């Protein structure tokens, strides 16, 4: 291959190369280039539209600042004399933290305030306003953990605050609670019911104030009770029907499919609604014997009042009378009541609709649909039951029972005072419809769980209510199964009948005894025989009060119920045996009441035993005082009672001689009543 050589003079490539020019001097033959010298400053060519670029060695002096709150790390504050949490947070720090955007920080703030309350004695009394007002906005918080912490916080707080101290804050807390019950989220509404339950226990009168205005446009006051009841209507999907009823229109049965609640959520709503209605409709006899069923038995109001006062309280104690015992009312309210009572409408086809009847009509569609959905799971034919659905059915029937008990009680009162005996109740068909749906599930069996037995007891009382209100349209088809159930319960399974169930069955017992039907005499025989088998003192108290009232019914002149079949010669022997068993119960109760072995935990039982002894003495005195009694033979009764009452005063022991009975340790009023009984019986109490 030929090589070309470059001639610099002629600027041409030559071949062969000139003489004296070697190949290594040619520029293409591997000549090493010289390195360019380093440049101190490189000039950058500016680009169009970019502006002047900063120098590469320029120093950036700009800075950014961000404020963060770290109260727990503030080392400049002296907190040695301030109440702090384990994280060294004061109350002011926690109050600021309740507004934090993080839900975890808000929850920690609530638990921190609870820690301060439970740790430092007197801290709650000094900071009541701050502790309550700070936590109120968190009742309707969007986070479930914050709401759970708030429920726990107020549970401890309200249990420690006296009622008079909490009274100024009740309205604010009720307002925030009713607002949370109307929240767009159903979960917030459900959790707000926990706070409502606390308020119903703490301030029931304020929480249920003017609840009737939710169903009556005449009450225009915007009260707490109205807002809470309207929130319940919205939860159950009957708000539109309630608004129509409030305007005086007919509340149609509306669909409730728009409200999607699970079984547990609906149970929570119904449990809170039942508690709210119990507090709203409370009366003096809500926790005692249900005497409403006896209202139609007397033609004279004075006799009814005297009958209701029997065993109501100890008549041996003097109660001071003050002007506070007189109920107050404004003049125009008294005048309106007098004028309404004076008006007599002769052309009345149905009884006027009360607030309770209107409420039952509004809730009927929702309650009945839920009941029909839950009954198959709660009362399965094979005996199995779902706990949630069983509780759901229980609270549904309790609400029905509470409403219809009040409706029919007021109806019986109006019949007695206004003489409207033939006026029916407008919505009695709804109660009959309910019983028609419950009838197939009422087997009359007392075997199974306690919940099933309690459901049967509620069914029996609903049957008695419907029978008392319907007269000629009485659901007689339900009575035979009820009679069989009562007979089985009294004769075969004594352990299943508690004092609460016995008390709930009293209206049913009275319905059976006062109605001329086959089997009522057998029920009275079973009641008298069951009394001798009772071992529980609370059940003894309830059973004695009921049977004693039945025994004293013939002594009232205005009695308008046919009870003569209850005092036939065959039943007189059973009554005689029953009254002769009372001295033994008297001695047992008096001995337990004055026993020195009674511990402090059973002081309430001792007081109940003393009350029972006083009532037995009062009944014996009322029975023995008249020379003639429609039920008992006076001479035979006095002769047989004398040796049975004597152990109350003294006992003849074969070795120890005369041993004093519990009489000397009884309170003085009880001793005076015992001495009054002894004056009618030939024994001496002073031995």
Named regions from a protein language model:
Residues 66-81, 110-122, 151-163, 200-219, ...:
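Boundary/linker elements of alpha-helical solenoid repeat scaffolds
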Residues 63-134, 140-168, 351-374, 423-436, ...:
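Alpha-solenoid helical repeat scaffolds
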Residues 364-368, 373-687:
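Long alpha-helical repeat scaffolds
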Residues 98-101, 140-145, 182-184, 238-242, ...:
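Short coil turns that connect the paired helices of HEAT/ARM alpha-solenoid repeats
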Residues 103-104, 144-148, 186-187, 263, ...:
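Alpha-helix N-cap/helix-start positions at coil->helix boundaries
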Residues 84-94, 123-138, 165-180, 205-238, ...:
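HEAT/HEAT-like alpha-solenoid repeats
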Residues 26-84, 240-441:
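Acidic, serine/threonine- and proline-enriched intrinsically disordered linkers and terminal tails
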Residues 112-118, 138-139, 150-161, 177-181, ...:
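Hydrophobic residues within the alpha-helices of tandem HEAT/HEAT-like
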């Amino acid at each position: 291959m030929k090589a070309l050589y470059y001639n610099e003079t002629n600027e041409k490539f030559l071949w062969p190369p000139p003489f004296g020019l070697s190949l290594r001097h040619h520029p293409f033959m591997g000549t090493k280039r010289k390195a360019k010298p380093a440049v101190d400053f490189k000039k950058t060519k500016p680009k169009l539209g970019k502006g002047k670029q900063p120098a590469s060695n320029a120093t950036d002096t700009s800075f950014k600042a961000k404020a963060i709150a770290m109260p727990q790390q503030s080392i400049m504050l002296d907190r040695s004399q301030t109440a702090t949490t384990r994280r060294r947070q004061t109350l002011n720090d926690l109050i600021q933290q309740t507004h934090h955007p993080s839900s975890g920080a808000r929850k920690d703030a609530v638990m921190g305030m609870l820690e301060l309350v439970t740790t430092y004695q007197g801290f709650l009394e000094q900071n009541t306003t701050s502790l309550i007002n700070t936590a109120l906005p968190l009742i309707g918080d969007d986070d479930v953990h914050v709401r759970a912490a708030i429920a726990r916080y107020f549970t401890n707080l309200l249990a420690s605050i006296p009622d008079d101290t909490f009274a100024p804050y009740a309205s604010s807390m009720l307002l925030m609670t009713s607002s949370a019950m109307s929240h767009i989220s159903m979960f917030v509404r459900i959790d707000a019911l926990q706070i409502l339950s606390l308020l119903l226990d703490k301030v029931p009168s304020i929480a249920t104030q003017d609840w009737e205005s939710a169903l009556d446009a005449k009450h225009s006051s915007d009260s707490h009770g109205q807002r809470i009841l309207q929130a319940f209507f919205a939860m159950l999907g009957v708000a539109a029907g309630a608004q129509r009823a409030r305007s005086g229109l007919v509340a149609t049965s509306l669909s409730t499919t728009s409200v999607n609640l699970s079984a547990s959520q609906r149970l929570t709503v119904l449990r809170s609604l039942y508690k709210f209605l119990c507090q709203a409709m409370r009366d003096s006899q809500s926790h005692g014997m249900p005497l409403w069923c006896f209202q139609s038995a007397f033609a004279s109001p004075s006799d009814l009042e005297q009958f209701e006062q029997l065993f109501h309280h100890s008549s041996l104690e003097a109660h001071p009378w003050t002007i506070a015992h007189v109920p107050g009312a404004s003049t125009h309210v008294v005048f309106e009541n007098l004028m309404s009572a004076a008006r007599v409408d002769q052309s009345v086809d149905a009884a006027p609709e009360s607030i309770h009847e209107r409420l039952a009509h509004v809730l009927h569609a929702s309650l009945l649909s839920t009941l029909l959905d839950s009954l198959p799971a709660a009362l399965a034919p094979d005996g199995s039951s779902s706990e949630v659905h069983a509780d759901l059915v229980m609270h549904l029937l309790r609400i029905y029972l509470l409403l219809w008990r009040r409706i029919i009680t007021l109806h019986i009162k109006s019949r007695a005072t206004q003489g409207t005996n033939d006026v029916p109740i407008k919505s009695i068909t709804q109660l009959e419809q309910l019983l028609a749906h419950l009838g197939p599930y009422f087997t009359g069996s007392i075997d199974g769980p306690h919940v099933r037995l309690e459901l049967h007891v509620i069914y029996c009382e609903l049957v008695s209510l419907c029978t008392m209100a319907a007269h000629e349209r009485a659901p007689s088809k339900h009575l035979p199964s009820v009679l069989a159930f009562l007979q089985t319960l009294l004769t075969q399974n004594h352990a299943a009948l508690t004092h609460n169930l016995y008390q709930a069955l009293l209206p049913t017992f009275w319905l059976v005894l006062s109605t001329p039907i086959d089997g009522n005499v057998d029920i009275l025989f079973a009641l008298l025989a069951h009394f001798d088998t009772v071992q529980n003192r609370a059940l003894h108290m309830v059973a004695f009060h009921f049977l004693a009232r039945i025994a004293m019914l013939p002594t009232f002149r205005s009695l308008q119920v046919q009870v003569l079949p209850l005092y036939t010669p065959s039943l007189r022997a059973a009554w005689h045996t029953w009254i002769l068993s009372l001295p033994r119960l008297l001695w047992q109760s008096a001995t337990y009441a004055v026993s020195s072995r009674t511990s402090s935990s059973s002081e309430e039982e001792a007081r109940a035993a003393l009350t029972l002894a006083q009532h037995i003495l009062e009944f014996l005195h009322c029975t023995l005082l008249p020379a003639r009694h429609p039920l008992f033979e006076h001479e035979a009764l006095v002769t047989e009672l004398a040796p049975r009452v004597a152990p109350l005063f003294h006992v003849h022991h074969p070795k120890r001689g005369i041993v004093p009975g519990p009489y000397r340790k009884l309170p003085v009023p009880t001793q005076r009543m015992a001495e009054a009984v002894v004056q009618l019986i030939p024994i001496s109490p002073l031995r």
